[in-house]
Design a protein with these regions (language model features):
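Non-transmembrane, aqueous-exposed alpha-helical and coiled segments at domain scale
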Residues: 144-159
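Secretory-pathway/luminal and periplasmic proteins that interact with or process carbohydrate-rich
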Residues: 169-173
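Flexible, D/E/H-enriched segments
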Residues: 1-27, 39-141, 152, 174-210
Length: 210
């Protein structure tokens, strides 16, 4: 779809990210994402779920798994992050032997080559599909705790943090197809210049804006 005018801007936007990762060559990508009821279901749905596996396969989301190889995990870093975050009062769930869906593999496949993948990943699944869900403030504090945890890891490795997902979008309901480009641009500015303002917003604030 790279030559399709409707899709081309997406691929174009990934090129600086691809170039940055190729230059920095991180050992591990900490992949913050949400599962789309592919491997995590509402009968046991956690706010924050950390992957601790040695490998993650591509999930079959109904039409067969994409032709991508599994990606390596980093169990040692996962164990350290899990212990550090629990000590920092984040009560996590943990998983292994569960495939990852397009929330991980779609951006990953556009950010780097896959034969083989040049970096391992540590996936962190955020449960945002079923209320109650974490507040923006809670997610901001988790990000701060993740930085402390990564910086305290004793091995000298490069870690890049990837946060996936769309900005404003509505995939079902009365506003299906809605997006808000002006809010998207403002959000991207604020996440760098004034994250406290974003952290103070409510779920209703975010839902209204998209």
């Amino acid at each position: 779809k790279q030559d399709d005018p409707a899709w081309a801007p997406i691929f174009e936007a990934y090129r600086p990210i691809t170039a940055w990762l190729a230059a920095k060559r991180p050992d591990v990508l900490l992949f913050i994402h949400n599962d789309h009821v592919t491997s995590f279901f509402f009968d046991h749905y956690s706010a924050f779920t950390l992957g601790i596996g040695a490998e993650y396969a591509v999930a079959d989301e109904g039409g067969g798994a994409r032709a991508l190889p599994p990606v390596r995990g980093h169990p040692a870093l996962s164990a350290h992050l899990g212990a550090a975050l629990m000590a920092d009062e984040f009560d996590l769930s943990f998983f292994q032997h569960r495939p990852l869906d397009h929330g991980c593999f779609s951006p990953l496949s556009m950010m780097m080559p896959h034969d083989p993948w040049p970096a391992a990943i540590v996936p962190l699944q955020v449960g945002v599909l079923q209320f109650p869900i974490p507040t923006a403030r809670r997610c901001y504090r988790l990000g701060q705790a993740l930085r402390r945890a990564i910086e305290s890891y004793p091995e000298d490795i490069g870690v890049a943090i990837v946060a996936t997902g769309g900005l404003s979008h509505q995939v079902h309901g009365e506003r299906a197809g809605f997006n808000n480009p002006a809010w998207d641009a403002q959000f991207l500015d604020l996440i760098e210049s004034d994250p406290e303002r974003l952290a103070n917003m409510t779920h209703a604030d975010y839902a209204t804006r998209g």
